[in-house]
Amino acid sequence: MINMLFIGSDHGGLEMKEELVKVLASRNLPTKDCGTTNDDSVDYPDFAEKVAGAVSRGEAELGILVCGTGIGMSIVANKFPGVRAALATDEFMAQMAKEHNNANVLVLGGRVLSVELATKMVNVWLDTAYEGGRHQLRLDKISQVEAAVRSGEL
């Protein structure tokens, strides 16, 4: 059971985010909507910081971010320690993001995906279990690189 999921978007992902909030509610998932709340132009880093920061600090187990393409949100989210944000464009990528990479943040493009496809992707991502095994060895290497960068070793 997921303890908490944070979701956020900029203006380019607002419509999709609002629909995904309904999907998450229908699944009875504890969810915090981190905004934006209207279609005024806003800066995507502000919302990526809220969601990825919560995941990084352990306040949220998972996060979902939506901007126009998903690219900007992915870049920001992956700056946070312990965040494995995956930009996905189809159901297979959403599945592999969790199954092989244990992605704890799913990033979507509100201007490049239909709400129907995004809904399917979110459901697949949430329903997919992390496989572990050889994939955990790779995630351990990522964690080692992350620690070395943060310490100034790399």
Predicted regions and their residues:
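Short, high-confidence coil segments that cap the C-terminus of an alpha-helix
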Residues: I2, E59-E61, N102
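Glycine-rich phosphate/diphosphate-binding loop of Rossmann-like nucleotide-binding domains
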Residues: F6-S26
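A short beta-strand-loop structural module common to alpha/beta enzyme folds
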Residues: P30-S41
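C-terminal binding/interaction regions
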Residues: F6-G8, G12-G13, E91-L154
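Short, structured coil segments at secondary-structure junctions
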Residues: R27, F80-P81, N101
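A general structural signal for well-ordered alpha-helical segments in protein cores
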Residues: K17, Y44, A48, M73, ...
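Helix-adjacent hinge/juxtasegments
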Residues: F47-L87
